[in-house]
Regions:
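Sequence-level preference for short, compositionally simple segments enriched
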Residues: 2-368
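Proline-enriched interdomain boundary motifs that mark the N-terminal boundary
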Residues: 367-376, 465-474
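Short, solvent-exposed loop/linker segments at the N-terminal edge
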Residues: 377-385, 475-481
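Acidic, Ser/Thr
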Residues: 391-399, 485-494
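Short, exposed coil/turn segments at beta-strand boundaries within extracellular/luminal domains
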Residues: 399, 447-457, 530
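Solvent-exposed loop segments of extracellular immunoglobulin-like
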Residues: 401-405, 491-500
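Surface-exposed, flexible coil segments in extracellular/virion-facing regions
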Residues: 413-429, 502-519
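A short beta-strand micro-motif common to beta-rich folds, especially ectodomain repeats
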Residues: 437-450, 525-529
Length: 530
């Protein structure tokens, strides 16, 4: 690639420059810290970026051989950062079409060169872009530099520890043709209001990826089962991505979750791959909530070796034939246009792919991608008041849009609840029978005609009445290796007693430990001694 003429808004970083050469031109640098200093970047404004062009080479934030321990510069910092960058609008552009040629690196992690989860960068500003470069933390992984093998560096430790890349408070972040390399807690520039990763490569283990972002034409190397800690907000969207599951060929079926603690995931036109004899079960999360719905369309798996989500769980919504699909893609005349403009355009019409005009002309903007209820659990009491259930539809960038929500009840006691429509986005739930004498639970499902779905539990409680009178004191009798509690009521009653058994070393029960509890409407009258 041709090197640009440097000026205050176009800086050049080249590690091969001699100090004398750098001193002759105020806009050329040979040190990554200096080119990202406040003084070097002060020409940037929100409307006009400073672009840093980076020649092929490895740019270390710290000496990779140093044994110094990095700590938090400020107690308020989330992590010990290698470098804090202040720039209203910053572009980092590698001067090679191969992102492996331009490497910004460190090799520190938690308890290995740092106290805490070492993170290369924190970027302050409104907008951040990266292109044609690798951002890597080589604490737990070797840096193999093909352009000059003599510059390759072995990992600092064999331990897989938290070794992070970067975060930002920017509103907009766009990475194109970049590589993000680490293992545990990859953290590939997280925190922006809107994030797009385009044609990027990721290597990581757990708790690693940005959980609120759009990934387009990206490749992922999964070395463990939970690459996202939580898909926060409106979640993560993967468009035309490939997931390489790097599990051993050991005959075991490996669980490939997307998240550790849940959140919405959307897969469009994506595929999974693994070694020839690797078996993988793909799931969204280990313990999905009743509200969780993840969406997919045209996702392919190696036949016979991968178990897809629609078989493995009930939280998957296929949107291939639904109107909701237009929130993510438009298919016309054999061509697919990914609707990133709908997902990330926001109030300021951000258009990182440059196809916003086509999307607007087609009328496929402001399409919601998430349906939420006020809670994941509601309570109804026999003889009590009705409850008002409200839902809302959100665009991917979090703006609420009007939509018509349809509600239905599912479960063994569904017929005992009446649904009254209040408005296009809410309903009233009322028990038909006020004489219900046991606790039960049903599922409330909410959905839109476009294809959005969510759910919640509705717990039904019997009417509270005064406790019945006992004919005498309760008695516990030993029957072999069983203790039996006996009691009678003065009048015939449906026994809903809540019996709890404790174990204690003394009669004062100061150190009591719960050993058995009753289930709803099933008093635990017998306790087995062990």
């Amino acid at each position: 690639m041709i090197k640009p003429d440097p000026d205050s808004c176009h800086l050049l970083l080249d590690s091969r420059f001699a100090n004398e050469e750098v001193q002759k031109n105020p806009y050329t640098y040979n040190n990554i810290r200096e080119v990202l200093s406040d003084g070097a970047l002060n020409a940037a404004t929100v409307e006009h970026p400073v672009t840093v062009y980076i020649a092929p080479g490895i740019y270390w934030l710290e000496n990779p051989q140093s044994e110094a321990v990095i700590v938090r510069e400020d107690p308020k910092d989330l992590y010990p950062y290698g470098c804090k960058v202040n720039c209203a609008n910053l572009k980092l552009v590698g001067l090679s079409e191969n992102p492996e040629d331009v490497v910004i690196a460190a090799n520190r992690g938690n308890d290995h060169g740092a106290k805490g989860n070492y993170t290369l960068f924190h970027f302050f500003g409104e907008q951040l872009e990266m292109e044609n470069l690798t951002l890597g933390n080589y604490c737990c992984v070797d840096l193999d530099y093909a352009l000059d093998p003599a510059q390759s560096v072995k990992k600092r430790t064999e331990a897989i520890t938290q070794a992070q890349l970067a975060d930002t408070n920017a509103d907009k972040f766009h990475a194109k043709n970049c590589r993000f390399v680490s293992r545990l807690n990859l953290y590939p520039v997280c925190g922006a209001g809107r994030s797009l990763y385009e044609h990027c490569h990721f290597e990581q283990t757990d708790d690693a990826l940005n959980g609120n972002a759009v990934y387009l034409d990206c490749e992922f190397d999964f070395y463990s089962g939970m690459p996202i800690y939580q898909a926060s907000g409106t979640g993560a969207v993967f468009l035309n991505c490939t997931f390489h599951c790097k599990y051993p060929q050991d005959g075991e079926t490996h669980a490939q979750y997307f998240t550790k603690v849940g959140g919405q995931i959307t897969l469009i036109d994506s595929s999974f791959a693994g070694l020839p004899d690797t078996k993988v079960a793909v799931l969204w999360t280990k313990y999905p909530s009743v509200a969780l719905k993840c969406y997919q369309a045209n996702v392919t798996y190696p036949e016979g070796r991968f178990t897809p989500p629609e078989v493995a769980d009930s939280h998957t919504v296929d949107i291939d034939e639904k109107m909701l699909a237009e929130a993510y893609y438009i298919r016309k005349d054999g061509e697919t246009i990914y609707n990133v403009y709908n997902l990330l355009g926001g109030k300021d019409d951000w258009d990182p792919l440059g196809n916003g005009e086509v999307i607007r002309f087609a009328g496929k903007t402001d399409i919601p991608t998430q349906l939420l209820l006020e809670s994941e659990a509601f309570e109804l009491e026999a003889g009590g008041s009705s409850i008002n259930i409200k839902g809302k539809c959100l665009t991917f960038d979090g703006r609420e849009r009007k939509c018509e929500i349809h509600f239905k009840i599912e479960g063994d006691s569904a017929d005992s609840i009446e649904i009254q429509r209040v408005s296009e986005g809410s309903c009233l739930l009322q028990l038909k029978d006020s004489n219900i004498d046991h606790e039960t639970e049903v599922v409330l499902t909410a959905q839109t005609k476009e294809g959005l779905q969510t759910g919640a539990y509705v717990r039904i409680h019997p009417r509270k009445v005064a406790a019945p009178r006992l004919t005498g004191n309760p008695v516990i009798c030993l029957e072999g290796k069983m203790l039996r509690l006996s009691y009678d009521f003065t009048e015939a009653e449906n026994d809903c007693s809540d019996i709890i058994w404790y174990r204690s070393r003394n009669i004062r029960v100061e150190d009591k430990i719960v050993t058995a509890i009753s289930q709803p409407d099933q008093p635990e009258k017998v306790y087995a001694l062990t």
